[in-house]
Amino acid sequence: MAWLQATIDSDSAVAERLADALMDAGALSTAIEDAWAGTDKEQPIFGEPGEPVDQLWSQSRIITLFDESADVALLIAAAANACQLAMPAYSVERVEEQDWVRLTQSQFEPIRISDRLWITPTWHEAPAPNAVNLQLDPGLAFGTGSHPTTRLCLQWLDKQLQGNESVLDYGCGSGILAIAALKLGAASAVGIDIDQQAVRASQDNAEQNGVKADFFLPNANPAAQYDVVLANILANPLRMLGDLLASHVKTGGRIVLSGILAEQADELSAIYSQWFEMDPPVFDEGWTRLTGTRRAAV
Protein backbone atom coordinates (compact mmCIF):
# COMPACT_ATOMS: atom_id res chain seq x y z
CA MET A 1 0.00 0.00 0.00
CA ALA A 2 1.15 3.55 -0.70
CA TRP A 3 -0.05 7.08 0.05
CA LEU A 4 0.15 10.46 -1.62
CA GLN A 5 1.87 13.14 0.44
CA ALA A 6 1.15 16.76 -0.45
CA THR A 7 3.34 19.59 0.79
CA ILE A 8 1.36 22.84 0.73
CA ASP A 9 2.70 26.37 1.22
CA SER A 10 0.56 28.55 3.47
CA ASP A 11 0.59 31.79 5.37
CA SER A 12 0.79 30.87 9.06
CA ALA A 13 -2.28 32.95 9.87
CA VAL A 14 -4.51 30.55 7.91
CA ALA A 15 -2.49 27.32 8.10
CA GLU A 16 -4.49 25.72 10.91
CA ARG A 17 -7.79 26.59 9.24
CA LEU A 18 -6.59 25.18 5.93
CA ALA A 19 -5.31 22.01 7.62
CA ASP A 20 -8.73 21.47 9.21
CA ALA A 21 -10.41 21.99 5.84
CA LEU A 22 -8.06 19.45 4.25
CA MET A 23 -9.15 16.88 6.85
CA ASP A 24 -12.79 17.69 6.11
CA ALA A 25 -12.05 17.24 2.39
CA GLY A 26 -10.67 13.74 2.91
CA ALA A 27 -7.04 13.99 4.00
CA LEU A 28 -5.85 11.14 6.22
CA SER A 29 -3.57 13.35 8.31
CA THR A 30 -2.09 16.84 8.40
CA ALA A 31 0.88 18.43 10.15
CA ILE A 32 2.01 22.06 10.20
CA GLU A 33 5.66 23.10 10.40
CA ASP A 34 7.88 26.10 9.74
CA ALA A 35 8.26 26.54 5.98
CA TRP A 36 11.98 27.09 6.66
CA ALA A 37 12.41 24.05 8.93
CA GLY A 38 15.87 22.58 8.64
CA THR A 39 17.42 25.78 7.29
CA ASP A 40 19.21 28.72 8.90
CA LYS A 41 15.96 30.70 8.54
CA GLU A 42 14.05 28.35 10.85
CA GLN A 43 12.37 30.21 13.71
CA PRO A 44 12.24 28.65 17.19
CA ILE A 45 8.90 28.39 18.93
CA PHE A 46 10.33 28.28 22.44
CA GLY A 47 13.10 29.94 24.38
CA GLU A 48 13.14 28.11 27.67
CA PRO A 49 11.16 24.89 27.14
CA GLY A 50 7.56 25.41 28.10
CA GLU A 51 7.64 29.19 27.74
CA PRO A 52 6.24 30.41 24.39
CA VAL A 53 7.75 33.50 22.86
CA ASP A 54 5.75 36.08 20.93
CA GLN A 55 7.27 35.38 17.54
CA LEU A 56 5.99 32.44 15.55
CA TRP A 57 7.05 31.59 12.01
CA SER A 58 5.28 33.65 9.34
CA GLN A 59 5.25 31.03 6.58
CA SER A 60 4.06 27.49 7.16
CA ARG A 61 4.26 24.19 5.37
CA ILE A 62 1.33 21.79 5.65
CA ILE A 63 2.27 18.13 5.22
CA THR A 64 -0.85 16.20 4.23
CA LEU A 65 -1.37 12.51 3.58
CA PHE A 66 -4.00 11.22 1.14
CA ASP A 67 -5.15 7.83 -0.04
CA GLU A 68 -3.30 6.72 -3.17
CA SER A 69 -6.49 6.94 -5.24
CA ALA A 70 -7.34 10.50 -4.16
CA ASP A 71 -7.55 13.41 -6.60
CA VAL A 72 -5.16 15.57 -4.61
CA ALA A 73 -5.56 18.72 -6.71
CA LEU A 74 -9.34 18.56 -6.42
CA LEU A 75 -9.25 18.04 -2.63
CA ILE A 76 -6.76 20.86 -2.05
CA ALA A 77 -8.89 23.15 -4.22
CA ALA A 78 -11.99 22.21 -2.22
CA ALA A 79 -10.22 22.93 1.07
CA ALA A 80 -8.90 26.27 -0.18
CA ASN A 81 -12.35 27.22 -1.44
CA ALA A 82 -13.89 26.33 1.94
CA CYS A 83 -11.43 28.76 3.53
CA GLN A 84 -12.05 31.38 0.82
CA LEU A 85 -8.40 31.17 -0.21
CA ALA A 86 -6.71 31.09 -3.59
CA MET A 87 -5.31 27.75 -4.71
CA PRO A 88 -2.01 27.38 -2.81
CA ALA A 89 1.27 26.18 -4.26
CA TYR A 90 1.87 22.51 -3.50
CA SER A 91 3.85 19.45 -4.48
CA VAL A 92 2.92 15.77 -4.33
CA GLU A 93 5.02 12.66 -3.85
CA ARG A 94 4.19 9.00 -3.48
CA VAL A 95 5.05 7.50 -0.09
CA GLU A 96 5.55 3.75 0.05
CA GLU A 97 4.36 1.72 2.99
CA GLN A 98 7.15 1.01 5.46
CA ASP A 99 7.70 -0.93 8.63
CA TRP A 100 7.12 2.18 10.73
CA VAL A 101 8.01 0.46 14.01
CA ARG A 102 11.35 -0.68 12.63
CA LEU A 103 11.96 2.74 11.08
CA THR A 104 11.25 4.50 14.36
CA GLN A 105 13.43 2.10 16.31
CA SER A 106 16.32 2.64 13.91
CA GLN A 107 16.40 6.31 14.92
CA PHE A 108 17.21 5.48 18.56
CA GLU A 109 20.64 4.05 19.22
CA PRO A 110 22.27 3.22 22.58
CA ILE A 111 23.57 6.30 24.38
CA ARG A 112 26.94 6.20 26.12
CA ILE A 113 27.02 8.21 29.35
CA SER A 114 30.38 6.85 30.49
CA ASP A 115 32.46 3.70 30.10
CA ARG A 116 30.30 1.95 32.70
CA LEU A 117 26.89 3.55 32.07
CA TRP A 118 24.79 3.18 28.92
CA ILE A 119 21.15 3.75 27.99
CA THR A 120 19.97 1.01 25.65
CA PRO A 121 16.55 0.67 23.95
CA THR A 122 14.93 -2.66 24.79
CA TRP A 123 15.07 -3.78 21.14
CA HIS A 124 18.80 -3.12 20.82
CA GLU A 125 21.65 -5.38 21.89
CA ALA A 126 23.74 -3.78 24.63
CA PRO A 127 27.00 -2.50 23.08
CA ALA A 128 28.79 -2.94 26.43
CA PRO A 129 27.24 -6.01 28.12
CA ASN A 130 29.40 -5.68 31.23
CA ALA A 131 28.44 -2.04 31.78
CA VAL A 132 25.42 -0.77 33.70
CA ASN A 133 22.75 -0.71 30.99
CA LEU A 134 19.54 1.21 31.55
CA GLN A 135 16.84 -0.26 29.33
CA LEU A 136 14.67 2.64 28.31
CA ASP A 137 12.51 3.25 25.24
CA PRO A 138 11.26 6.60 23.93
CA GLY A 139 7.80 7.13 25.32
CA LEU A 140 5.28 9.57 26.72
CA ALA A 141 7.41 10.82 29.62
CA PHE A 142 10.49 13.01 29.30
CA GLY A 143 13.89 11.49 29.91
CA THR A 144 15.69 9.07 27.59
CA GLY A 145 19.23 10.31 28.24
CA SER A 146 19.62 12.03 24.91
CA HIS A 147 18.97 15.53 26.27
CA PRO A 148 21.95 17.39 27.80
CA THR A 149 20.12 18.00 31.09
CA THR A 150 19.45 14.30 31.64
CA ARG A 151 22.98 13.46 30.57
CA LEU A 152 24.43 15.98 33.06
CA CYS A 153 22.49 14.39 35.92
CA LEU A 154 23.44 10.85 34.90
CA GLN A 155 27.10 11.81 34.70
CA TRP A 156 26.90 13.19 38.23
CA LEU A 157 25.33 9.99 39.54
CA ASP A 158 27.94 7.90 37.75
CA LYS A 159 30.84 9.84 39.28
CA GLN A 160 29.52 10.80 42.71
CA LEU A 161 27.35 7.99 44.10
CA GLN A 162 29.30 6.00 46.67
CA GLY A 163 26.63 3.37 47.33
CA ASN A 164 23.79 2.89 49.83
CA GLU A 165 22.44 6.44 49.45
CA SER A 166 18.77 7.37 49.61
CA VAL A 167 17.78 9.32 46.49
CA LEU A 168 14.84 11.55 45.55
CA ASP A 169 14.17 12.33 41.87
CA TYR A 170 11.85 15.35 41.87
CA GLY A 171 10.14 15.71 38.50
CA CYS A 172 11.02 12.14 37.59
CA GLY A 173 9.56 12.03 34.05
CA SER A 174 10.52 8.56 32.81
CA GLY A 175 12.12 7.65 36.14
CA ILE A 176 15.52 7.45 34.49
CA LEU A 177 17.47 9.17 37.28
CA ALA A 178 15.92 7.14 40.11
CA ILE A 179 16.47 3.93 38.13
CA ALA A 180 20.06 4.85 37.31
CA ALA A 181 20.76 5.67 40.95
CA LEU A 182 19.57 2.22 42.04
CA LYS A 183 21.56 0.43 39.36
CA LEU A 184 24.63 2.44 40.39
CA GLY A 185 24.34 1.34 44.01
CA ALA A 186 21.84 3.57 45.81
CA ALA A 187 19.98 1.83 48.61
CA SER A 188 16.60 3.36 47.78
CA ALA A 189 15.04 5.80 45.34
CA VAL A 190 11.80 7.74 45.22
CA GLY A 191 10.44 9.67 42.25
CA ILE A 192 7.86 12.46 42.25
CA ASP A 193 6.05 13.95 39.27
CA ILE A 194 2.97 16.11 38.78
CA ASP A 195 1.89 13.95 35.82
CA GLN A 196 0.13 10.67 36.60
CA GLN A 197 1.23 9.36 33.21
CA ALA A 198 4.87 9.98 34.15
CA VAL A 199 4.36 8.15 37.44
CA ARG A 200 3.00 5.12 35.59
CA ALA A 201 5.77 5.26 32.97
CA SER A 202 8.39 5.43 35.73
CA GLN A 203 6.91 2.40 37.48
CA ASP A 204 6.92 0.44 34.22
CA ASN A 205 10.51 1.45 33.46
CA ALA A 206 11.67 0.44 36.94
CA GLU A 207 10.12 -3.00 36.47
CA GLN A 208 11.74 -3.27 33.04
CA ASN A 209 15.11 -2.62 34.67
CA GLY A 210 14.60 -5.00 37.57
CA VAL A 211 14.76 -2.38 40.32
CA LYS A 212 12.30 -1.37 43.04
CA ALA A 213 11.58 2.34 43.27
CA ASP A 214 8.55 4.20 44.57
CA PHE A 215 6.91 6.87 42.43
CA PHE A 216 4.29 9.35 43.64
CA LEU A 217 2.32 12.44 42.78
CA PRO A 218 3.49 15.38 44.95
CA ASN A 219 0.57 15.25 47.38
CA ALA A 220 1.04 11.51 47.92
CA ASN A 221 4.75 11.63 48.72
CA PRO A 222 5.59 10.86 52.36
CA ALA A 223 7.67 13.54 54.07
CA ALA A 224 11.27 12.35 54.22
CA GLN A 225 14.86 13.49 53.85
CA TYR A 226 17.38 11.99 51.46
CA ASP A 227 21.11 11.83 50.91
CA VAL A 228 20.71 13.02 47.32
CA VAL A 229 17.92 15.07 45.73
CA LEU A 230 17.86 15.53 41.95
CA ALA A 231 15.55 17.94 40.13
CA ASN A 232 15.88 18.01 36.35
CA ILE A 233 12.98 20.31 35.60
CA LEU A 234 13.02 23.98 34.51
CA ALA A 235 14.25 27.26 35.92
CA ASN A 236 10.84 28.66 36.87
CA PRO A 237 9.75 25.70 39.02
CA LEU A 238 13.25 25.51 40.49
CA ARG A 239 12.91 29.14 41.57
CA MET A 240 9.66 28.34 43.39
CA LEU A 241 10.66 24.97 44.84
CA GLY A 242 13.90 25.92 46.54
CA ASP A 243 12.62 25.76 50.11
CA LEU A 244 10.73 22.51 49.46
CA LEU A 245 13.66 20.78 47.79
CA ALA A 246 16.05 21.95 50.51
CA SER A 247 13.73 20.49 53.16
CA HIS A 248 14.13 17.05 51.58
CA VAL A 249 17.96 17.06 51.75
CA LYS A 250 19.72 15.76 54.84
CA THR A 251 22.39 17.94 56.42
CA GLY A 252 25.54 17.19 54.45
CA GLY A 253 23.45 15.73 51.64
CA ARG A 254 23.69 16.73 48.01
CA ILE A 255 21.37 18.53 45.61
CA VAL A 256 21.62 18.22 41.83
CA LEU A 257 19.71 20.68 39.65
CA SER A 258 19.35 20.81 35.88
CA GLY A 259 16.93 22.01 33.22
CA ILE A 260 18.68 25.36 33.61
CA LEU A 261 19.88 27.43 30.67
CA ALA A 262 23.45 28.73 30.91
CA GLU A 263 22.30 32.32 31.33
CA GLN A 264 20.09 31.31 34.29
CA ALA A 265 22.86 29.58 36.24
CA ASP A 266 24.03 32.53 38.36
CA GLU A 267 20.51 33.42 39.46
CA LEU A 268 19.61 29.84 40.42
CA SER A 269 22.91 29.31 42.18
CA ALA A 270 22.30 32.45 44.25
CA ILE A 271 18.81 31.26 45.21
CA TYR A 272 20.00 27.84 46.36
CA SER A 273 22.99 29.25 48.21
CA GLN A 274 20.49 30.10 50.98
CA TRP A 275 20.57 26.42 51.93
CA PHE A 276 23.57 24.90 50.14
CA GLU A 277 27.27 25.40 49.64
CA MET A 278 27.10 25.61 45.87
CA ASP A 279 29.70 24.12 43.53
CA PRO A 280 30.83 25.70 40.24
CA PRO A 281 28.29 25.07 37.46
CA VAL A 282 28.88 22.49 34.74
CA PHE A 283 27.72 23.26 31.18
CA ASP A 284 26.68 21.09 28.23
CA GLU A 285 25.28 22.47 24.96
CA GLY A 286 23.94 25.63 26.59
CA TRP A 287 22.45 23.82 29.60
CA THR A 288 23.68 23.82 33.18
CA ARG A 289 24.02 21.45 36.10
CA LEU A 290 24.16 23.00 39.57
CA THR A 291 25.15 21.00 42.64
CA GLY A 292 25.53 21.84 46.30
CA THR A 293 25.94 20.44 49.82
CA ARG A 294 23.22 21.05 52.43
CA ARG A 295 24.21 23.20 55.36
CA ALA A 296 22.77 22.56 58.80
CA ALA A 297 19.49 24.39 59.35
CA VAL A 298 19.90 27.49 61.50
From Swiss-Prot:
Keywords: Cytoplasm, Methyltransferase, S-adenosyl-L-methionine, Transferase. The keyword Iron does not apply. Its EC number is 2.1.1.-. S-adenosyl-L-methionine binds at T150, G171, D193, N232. One of its GO terms (biological process) is methylation. Coiled coil: none annotated. Pfam families: PrmA. One of its GO terms (cellular component) is cytosol. Methylates ribosomal protein L11. This is Ribosomal protein L11 methyltransferase. The lineage of its organism: Bacteria, Pseudomonadati, Pseudomonadota, Betaproteobacteria, Neisseriales.
